[in-house]
Amino acid sequence: MIQSKKLTLGICLVLLIILIVGYVIMTKTNGRNAQIKDTFNQTLKLYPTKNLDGFYDKEGFRDQEFKKGDKGTWIVNSEMVIEPKGKDMETRGMVLYINRNTRTTKGYYFISEMTDDSNGRPKDDEKRYPVKMEHNKIIPTKPLPNDKLKKEIENLKFFVQYGNFKDINDYKDGDISYNPNVPSYSAKYQLNNDDYNVQQLRKRYDIPTKQAPKLLLKGDGDLKGSSVGSKNIEFTFVENKEENIYFTDSVQYTPSEDTRYESN
């Protein structure tokens, strides 16, 4: 009888320990997930910034990487990647470096085509066209091969100018992950074609699929904030070995000396 009571007590004690450990792990995970969401929300608050000139007066997260007196540089990037079945992958996009010290903006529009060389190895053929921004208008700084490309560059709008995530907290069934070794973190949501941001992308790009995309928010670096980390937004419409269609966007605040770039 006594042994039976001891056995029962032992089992209860083990179950109690399991419940406590499980609760601690769940609480820690929920807390980290909330921190990841909050980290992304800090970036998503920038959407929309309709006039890119507004970044001259915006300050992002600063740490010891910034030198005294450096107001920092914003890097904005939007690109559309389309690889239909049986065809080469083509990427079109633009990168701007918005320098808050000089209140000047330079960058480039690029067209990249992924092909195979004579040995069947992947080869990335990229062309860059330098641009500058004045009074919120994109201006090519070198002659362009045709008027169509000129119009395409001048009319481009970055996703940060029209994207809107005011309903991000209403997105359901998000898959949140964290890798402490990098560290890196992400949040993934399945969207539908009625989503505002999806409609805006379809309005501006010829997206050759009716499939609704997944929204993937990706980040790396310290969750508390870091100028050496990055955060990216990706709308993945199709992703497989034969076909890839996705849109990526990023807005990053960095020390000005780290923003050298090349254009050709």
Swiss-Prot record:
Sorted UniProt keywords: Cell membrane, Membrane, Transmembrane, Transmembrane helix
Pfam families (UniProt xref): DUF576 (PF04507)
TM helices/strands, residue ranges: 7-27
Record flagged with keyword Plastid: no
Topology class, membrane: Single-pass membrane protein
Cell location: Cell membrane
Main location as per UniProt: membrane
Any one GO cellular component localisation term in the record: plasma membrane
Family, as annotated: Belongs to the staphylococcal tandem lipoprotein family.
Protein name as annotated: Uncharacterized protein SAR2570
